[in-house]
Amino acid sequence: MAAAEPMGPAQVPMNSEVIVDPIQGQVNFEDVFVYFSQEEWVLLDEAQRLLYRDVMLENFALMASLGHTSFMSHIVASLVMGSEPWVPDWVDMTLAVATETPGGSDPGCWHGMEDEEIPFEQSFSIGMSQIRIPKGGPSTQKAYPCGTCGLVLKDILHLAEHQETHPGQKPYMCVLCGKQFCFSANLHQHQKQHSGEKPFRSDKSRPFLLNNCAVQSMEMSFVTGEACKDFLASSSIFEHHAPHNEWKPHSNTKCEEASHCGKRHYKCSECGKTFSRKDSLVQHQRVHTGERPYECGECGKTFSRKPILAQHQRIHTGEMPYECGICGKVFNHSSNLIVHQRVHTGARPYKCSECGKAYSHKSTLVQHESIHTGERPYECSECGKYFGHKYRLIKHWSVHTGARPYECIACGKFFSQSSDLIAHQRVHNGEKPYVCSECGKAFSHKHVLVQHHRIHTGERPYKCSECGKAFRQRASLIRHWKIHTGERP
């Protein structure tokens, strides 16, 4: 086994080439690692150090998921423990080229050799590579849940190893083009292609990219450029001026240099929209041409994009690969799982710009906004009546058809809507799912709870236009209005 000369972290050349095996496409962890001296490290604040740690650990997880588990084990261990990343005095920095062994080590990989006299307390492994953590490490660590099956792992290294048990599972999907990824970081990098955002913004960050461009030949990219920019840009010690022509992420097309400069060269002749990639333009043009080249073999339905066809086919196969880690409910689309999880988190990301009311679904916000705009886009073809919500039109349509397909098995009463049947059944079972947060009183219908809650808030939204008197309930306003009209109540 041939050994190289000892090398400290400050001696590592920042613009060294990535070692790539021409057959295997081997990429080493050292090639995407950012080195700091102790003097450089103290200039970073806490947020920058945490960002550094997260970026490096995610890079390692990506390496491990690809089966490339070569790394400097003492540095990865210090990242897991949250300690400083520079090389301690007790570490023997002798690097050796590992030969192929019966244990299955990858040929041509670099492995860090530690001092055998240093006592260690914990150890854990990824594949054939083992990390040992010194005594005195933290007793508690952050939990890392698997985005595919919900299993919670104790560290990111075990998570990376576990995710290899889900072949072909890519839970992170781009909502613009349907492309799927194993890691959220890859999705984030991919989305910059749609937004036109430049992945690497200045020559200042070049020394820390460690020729990340060479890694782009693989299917998964590493989080080094954009994420590192946030803490590199704040410190003047990282200034490095290099001519633009030294940095060549690609080599063949004319558009690649323009893409690095943030330009978009592929323009749609129909609407003028521009794209940085030709395949994105081709997909977009199907909006104008109506082309749907991907056909479902089961039902014959066609789609403009292959990932959408794959999602559709789960209707026929019954496949439900996305499971909620909290309640166990399964879904056929990752987007449905994301929307469902808002039930548990209470997240309401869609906010009305007029009144500030927030909703968990975008469609609900659109329906709500019609209250402010007065828009009623849904017209009944029978009587010409307009409605602000589509579901109200559907409900109204039963007036003309007389259809009441939903029957109560307790009393035989029929209803035109399933929601009306569910609400009616509470008369029989006594269920009162809507509880007042102020006094604890429960109600069988949500609108009754809303009316009751106004007792606590003092809200009186229904105002008489004649005398100005306000009421908590609409029915009370209608009864009051008869005083002015002279109509007998």
UniProtKB/Swiss-Prot annotation:
* Gene name in the database record: ZNF772
Name listed for the protein in its UniProt record: Zinc finger protein 772
Q: What are its GO cellular component terms?
A: nucleus
Compartmental location: Nucleus
Q: What is the lineage of its organism?
A: Eukaryota, Metazoa, Chordata, Craniata, Vertebrata
Alphabetical GO biological process terms? regulation of transcription by RNA polymerase II
Q: In the UniProt record, does the keyword Repeat occur?
A: yes
Which PROSITE patterns does the record cross-reference, listed alphabetically? Answer: KRAB (PS50805), ZINC_FINGER_C2H2_1 (PS00028), ZINC_FINGER_C2H2_2 (PS50157)
- Predominant place of localization: nucleus
